[in-house]
Amino acid sequence: MARTQAEPPASQPDARAAWLRDQLERANYAYYVLDQPDLPDAEYDRLFRELQQLETDHPELVTPDSPTQRVGGEAAGGFTPVVHDAPMLSLNNGFADEDIAAFDKRVADALDKTTDLAGSVTEPVEYACELKFDGLAISLRYEQGVFVQASTRGDGTTGEDVTENVRTIRSIPLKLKGKHVPAVLDVRGEVLMFKRDFARLNERQRAAEQREFANPRNAAAGSLRQLDSKITAQRPLSFFAYGIGVLDGMPMLDTHSALLDWYESLGLPVNREREVVQGAEGLLGFFRKIGEKRESLPYDIDGVVYKVNRRDEQERLGFVSRAPRFALAHKFPAQEALTKLVAIDVQVGRTGAITPVARLEPVFVGGATVTNATLHNEDEVRRKDIRIGDTVIVRRAGDVIPEVVGALLDRRPADAAEFVMPTECPVCGSKIERLPDEAIARCTGGLFCPAQRKQALWHFAQRRALDIDGLGEKIIDQLVELNLVRTPADLFNLGFATLAELDRFAEKSAQNLLDSLEKAKHTTLARFIYGLGIRHVGESTAKDLAKHFGSLTPIMDASIEELLEVNDVGPIVAESLHQFFAEEHNRTVIEQLRAPGKVTWPEGPPAPKAPQGVLAGKTVVLTGTLPTLTRDAAKEMLEAAGAKVAGSVSKKTDYVVAGAEAGSKLVKAEELGIPVLDEDGLHQLLEGNTP
């Protein structure tokens, strides 16, 4: 939502307060009515606290419609308004340990709890601790134990009737359990979506080519406020009860913890991550315990909630205009925050992947100061329309690498610059290329680039490549970090004295590695090609290349068209090969590897051109015993004619040659309608005739 009003300075408190009210009301409307939040929580909290402080310093600036005096937005036009019998209030927030200690002190003082001479509470208050879910608050009304209405919070006084949608949530009972139920019960709780259900929903959205949801809260809110309850019924929503509005027909329970236990007996879903504690230390202990397990919880939370446990003490403490005095939300460090993107650089990964990285003005988010954040790839930068100079939303959750979620387009400066992917690697100067149908651009200097050095050496030494026994990752780390090895060719220059000085490398280990390196000098062309670590070139493709060309030079000089003639080499593999050998840095390292005294292999003639007869490219399956041909002889003749001999029958099979006692392969061929030949039919094919 656009925020075009100019931001007044703090030296103009009346204008500043009006601007803050406008910003917060716009955010409230986007959050509560449109279900499209456009401000991170941390930014909203910052603006809200600033307005609170302004109104405290200048009481004359307080207006009846100030966001500090109410909860959220107005009911949207698509749903029937519902006036709450008991207001659905918000909670005041605490962020630091000092905030929690101050809350406990205020409560204890108001309840006339005993304190010592230093002012410390010696008669601790009992609190019920719960999770603060990141979902949508609702009220469920039961009459004589039967579910009759559900409504959203709205502005705390008036919400929206979402009864038919809530009726589709399977975890919400339509009738309460037990013989003794109240005449009227308003249950307060949260509609949310579990992480696993959110992932499945987005999978369905992708499969249907529909817009994906940004996060579980948006998905839950959007699902709950569908005008068609059939759509809501298809969404995997859940519910947890945590509070009460109206109770008629039976006395109120003595404690909040007893209320939640009673809810469970009625069949209402109540979260088990709750605890009764004493005083500020107990509150902080619960907060830390939940913080440690936060990422492993099956749903999103953004903090915990503390409530004075005894009902009579809650009543004594009462309410302020927008929140109860007996409760506090203790929020985790914000996982999203706003900052300025000052530059976009690129990083080179171990495999040559080029990743755009946002350089940011320092911002505290997710419990740490963040100055860099990933932009994933060039397509993501374009899709999110992120530009240098933008005010951006940065997200950091747990140990996840910080990322730029998006930009606030209404704050974009006139000189904001688009990101341009460089054409040369910033580390080694090799060309940057991006293969068709791939999102990631890569440095093509795989054998030369320092950023890829360890990965290139590790791959080169693999058992299926040069098979250098004893050259593990820890040894490679030392060799690279001590600048003893820069490319695979340098491995063959290592001497005994150098190796023997490596950490935890005895003389015997040094000699064993030298022996392995000497042995690795005598290899095969296929192993050497595989060892180069060319993207998309596996062991099988390396063998096909060696068989087709016979020697390395023709492969290095081959055009894409010539590479496409190789068995099982398609456009992507051909392009990858061509890019790799076109990079001069790679060719230099290869020549160093082929220098006298280094790596050698037996050369062979190029394979003859593939036959062009009726069997060329066909797949044939042999089964049973033929009258005059052994299976090996038949296979050799078929392969010489350009056919591929497979071991099982599938839809891709062109012919089945069946002899005596053919068995299940013959049955499957007949089921699939695949032509079945005897030995005479095979000879006709080999002679170029279609049977």
From Swiss-Prot:
It is an enzyme of class 6 (ligase). Its EC number is 6.5.1.2. The keyword Zinc applies. It comes from the Bacteria. GO terms for biological process: DNA repair; DNA replication. Gene3D superfamilies: 5' to 3' exonuclease, C-terminal subdomain, 6.20.10.30, BRCT domain, DNA ligase/mRNA capping enzyme, Helix hairpin bin, Nucleic acid-binding proteins. Residues 610-691 form the BRCT domain. Zn(2+) binds at residues 425, 428, 443, 449. The active site is at 132 (n6-amp-lysine intermediate). Keywords: DNA damage, DNA repair, DNA replication, Ligase, Magnesium, Manganese, Metal-binding, NAD, Zinc. DNA ligase that catalyzes the formation of phosphodiester linkages between 5'-phosphoryl and 3'-hydroxyl groups in double-stranded DNA using NAD as a coenzyme and as the energy source for the reaction. It is essential for DNA replication and repair of damaged DNA. Belongs to the NAD-dependent DNA ligase family. LigA subfamily. This is DNA ligase. It comes from Burkholderia lata (strain ATCC 17760 / DSM 23089 / LMG 22485 / NCIMB 9086 / R18194 / 383).
